[in-house]
Amino acid sequence: MKTAVVLSIRGRQSYDGQEPDVIELVTDGVMEFRDGGWDISYEESELTGLAGVTTTFRVEPNKVVLTRTGALRSQMVFEKGVRHDSLYQMPFGAMMLTVCATSLFFDITPEGGMIDLVYTIDIEHAEAGVVDYHLDIQAK
């Protein structure tokens, strides 16, 4: 059964030689337990620069999978200490990304929970920076 939730999302992206970029967003979403894991989904907005995109965090016992569909498509797999390649599809083309979670913690219950994720990102095989996400999930 899907549960309506409120998501508080804070993302901090630090790229080599640049000031960190911080995005904070509070938005409505849905949460559902299925096939042994949690799916937490929401619609992106102009604020994130990803209008027309649906983002889903799939939380499984030892990993989190971030999937984006719509105006752009991507799937990134996060397991602590494991490097994962993914293709990031955008309207003007695709890029190869490699992500590696350096920190991954989550605690999800039917009432909500949280996800803390820190990962390094390589773009086209070149080290690009570090991304830090924190999601608070609250059932409505």
Question: Which positions does each model-derived feature cover?
Answer:
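Charged phosphate-binding loop/patch that engages nucleotide di/tri-phosphates or the phosphate backbone
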Residues: 131
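N-terminal intrinsically disordered, cationic/polar leader segments
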Residues: 1-123, 128, 140
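Flexible glycine-rich active-site/ligand-binding loops centered on an Asp-His dyad
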Residues: 134-140
